[in-house]
């Protein structure tokens, strides 16, 4: 049948991939299609393993078109120094911030990453954690259903810090939300709070339910861990 590729035929596969690269280049640079640029990145990463070129396309697509998922991936490149880029956490934070403000598959995770970097403090002018900014971006990601952000919020309210008082009620609220989203340690923390009546009314039955939920999540995570294979 015309148009179908026989993937057992090396020449057909080679021709197919070459055509794919040309098509993605055309979509990106001639048709000015940000999604075409992102497909070109997928091709460069997945087929050619050319991460230096992929970094250039990501930078172009993020800066020129503000493509959210490209900004997210460019931020990840800056975090590790991938694709020939100099490792730069401030640049990474800027990229994640752009992605956070844009619709996209990685928008919520980008907000979480902005929170993480603000919480860590290395990207801040004084090198100290910016707990207000961290809380704001964790909150956005948590509202978007990102479990790790909800858990981090619960930990912030659980521990407290200068200018950021402890609030066990909020700590429990965010632990419960993270637990509902499948975060095993959040379930364990919430269970303990209900068992002790710490920030909430003591409820041993609810504590037991949450403890069992934590156990079940842990069991599922262990089941999903792939064994190492050699040879």
From Swiss-Prot:
Sel1-like repeats: 34-66, 68-104, 108-146, 147-183, 184-219
Major location (coarse): mitochondrion
Gene Ontology molecular function terms on file: protein-disulfide reductase activity
Biological process per Gene Ontology, one example term: respiratory chain complex IV assembly
SUPFAM superfamilies from the UniProt entry: HCP-like (SSF81901)
Places the protein is found: Mitochondrion intermembrane space
Tree of life domain: Eukaryota
Modified residues (N-acetylalanine): 2
Keywords (A to Z) from UniProt: Acetylation, Mitochondrion, Repeat
Protein's job: Required for assembly of mitochondrial respiratory chain complex I and complex IV.
PANTHER family linked to this entry: CYTOCHROME C OXIDASE ASSEMBLY FACTOR 7
Family: Belongs to the hcp beta-lactamase family.
Protein's name in the database: Cytochrome c oxidase assembly factor 7
Lineage: Eukaryota, Metazoa, Chordata, Craniata, Vertebrata
The gene coding this protein: Coa7
């Amino acid at each position: 049948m015309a148009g179908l590729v026989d993937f057992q035929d090396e020449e057909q596969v080679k021709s197919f991939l070459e055509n794919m690269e040309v098509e993605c280049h055309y979509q990106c640079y001639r048709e000015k299609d940000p999604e075409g640029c992102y497909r070109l990145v997928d091709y460069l990463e997945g087929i050619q393993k050319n991460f230096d070129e992929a970094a250039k396309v990501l930078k172009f697509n993020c800066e020129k078109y503000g493509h959210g998922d490209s900004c997210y991936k460019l931020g990840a490149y800056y975090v590790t120094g991938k694709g020939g880029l100099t490792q730069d956490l401030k640049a990474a934070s800027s990229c994640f911030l752009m992605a956070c403000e844009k619709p996209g598959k990685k928008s919520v995770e980008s907000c979480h990453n902005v929170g993480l970097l603000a919480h860590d403090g290395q990207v801040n002018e004084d090198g100290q954690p910016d707990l207000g900014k961290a809380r704001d971006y964790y909150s956005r990601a948590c509202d978007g259903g990102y479990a790790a952000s909800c858990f981090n919020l619960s930990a912030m309210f659980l521990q407290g810090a200068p200018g950021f008082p402890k609030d066990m009620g909020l700590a429990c609220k965010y632990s419960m939300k993270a637990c509902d989203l499948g975060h095993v340690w959040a379930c364990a923390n919430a269970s303990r709070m209900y068992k002790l009546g710490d920030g909430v009314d003591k409820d041993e039955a609810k504590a037991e339910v949450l403890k069992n939920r934590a156990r079940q999540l842990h069991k599922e995570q262990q089941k999903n861990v792939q064994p190492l294979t050699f040879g």
